[in-house]
Amino acid sequence: MKAAVLREINKPLEIEDVQTGNPAPREVLVRTVAAGVCHSDLHFQNGSYPYPLPAVLGHESAGVVEAVGADVTYVKPGDHVITCLSAFCGHCEHCLTGHMSLCGEPELQRAADQPSRLAKKDEA
């Protein structure tokens, strides 16, 4: 799939072909049909919201569910969905000090031994 990738702060986004991994038990794979880059994405781009790079921006999207993890019961393949891919717990130190993009809540993170969610096609 194509993605708007931020590789460096204060640099233009690069449209790249990326591959996605299979969804973990509580994840959903969505084939994006439309996405927008909003003001919060600009905060990532200018470094106001620190976040590990590279990062895919355009977190508000609409699409079709392609696959679901084993524990997902609220959507199924073929469902049309809208998304906001921001995930944070709201109670850790990062969240309470306004740095939700750094939330480290284990329930919201992919385990270190799991493959990356995204890979550039020529780097996969």
Roles of regions detected by a PLM:
Residues 14, 38, 64:
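Conserved Rossmann-like nucleotide-binding pocket used by diverse enzymes
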Residues 5-12:
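Extracellular beta-rich ligand/substrate-recognition surface
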Residues 40-44:
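Cytochrome P450 core scaffold surrounding the K-helix E-X-X-R motif
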Residues 109-124:
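Charged, glycine/proline-rich intrinsically disordered loops and linkers
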Residues 104:
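A nucleotide-sugar donor-handling region in carbohydrate enzymes
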Residues 1-2:
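Extreme N-terminal starter segment of soluble prokaryotic enzymes
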Residues 21-35, 46-96, 101, 109, ...:
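Glycine-rich beta-strand-centered segment in the early N-terminal region that forms part
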